[in-house]
Amino acid sequence: MNGNIISFFIDSSTKYEDRIVYFRQISEFLSGLECNYPFFNEWLDKVYHELSQGKRTVIILVDKPSCKIIGLAILKDSIQEKKICTLRVAASHQHQGCGSYLIEQSIRLLKDPKPLITVSEEHVDAFKPLFRRFGFKIEDRVKSV
């Protein structure tokens, strides 16, 4: 990652007003994924509510010059599962270490060296090099709803 990228995370300790602003930007950054994930908008609403309940954390990467989100990881941290629900890096910043950084930070925050990670079938091949780097293996495939 280059020096023009800053990272931070939002969780239940983030001020309500800031969560609203960040979530608008997150929603915009993730737009376009609706076609790969059934009930995507409903899921995103659920993530927002669980964020305020302390069940989710979002790691965000921002390009300083443009002030735009260029990457994020949405985490679910519960007794039942430690999970990277969403991992996305803008095409303009792929192959620059952003995805690796997000996984490293996810592992640190989840306190689990091998958290569950879900990826749509359409994107599995794109993630293979990153998964190999961290020793992730395909454990299961779930057919879309």
Where are these regions (language model features)?
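Conserved acetyl-CoA binding element of GNAT-fold acetyltransferases
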Residues: 76, 80-91
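Conserved active-site alpha-helix within GNAT-family acetyltransferase domains
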Residues: 121-144
